[in-house]
Amino acid sequence: MNSDYYDYDALLKRAVSQLPEEVFKDVRFEVPHADSFVEGNRTMVKNFVDISKVIRREPQFFAKYVLKELGTAGDVEGPRLILQGKFGNYIINSKIKKFVDEYVLCPECGKPDTKIIKEGRIHFLKCMACGAMKPIKLI
């Protein structure tokens, strides 16, 4: 047999070469802040769809979470989210950050390269960079 077959350094190099490129990227992920304003008794988040594209989640799924956390009704209309009630930027941004922590960032490596997949009756947050899977509860 070839002695390189069991050589530790050769095995390590081979294993590292098979890892996806995302593992080696050290790019800082930043969620854009909500651009919101109050109009009458409603709050509008102007860049809601843009935020959902950055975090790579469906706007309806993301909106459902924000609405539940704020305890209000609302709807996605075009590129914005309309909330019933008056909410400040701080509270909206804190709910967005909480969503990102629970449903976007990998619990193992902290990267945002994740997908929500379903296996059987259980939904998982699967990291495409490191391969970790975490069970999550849907909204």
From Swiss-Prot:
Keywords: Initiation factor, Protein biosynthesis. GO terms for molecular function: translation initiation factor activity. InterPro entries: IF2/IF5, TIF2_bsu_arc, Transl_init_fac_IF2/IF5_dom, Transl_init_fac_IF2/IF5_N, Transl_init_fac_IF2/IF5_Zn-bd. SMART domains: eIF2B_5. Gene3D superfamilies: 3.30.30.170. Heterotrimer composed of an alpha, a beta and a gamma chain. PANTHER family: EUKARYOTIC TRANSLATION INITIATION FACTOR, EUKARYOTIC TRANSLATION INITIATION FACTOR 2 SUBUNIT 2. This is Translation initiation factor 2 subunit beta.
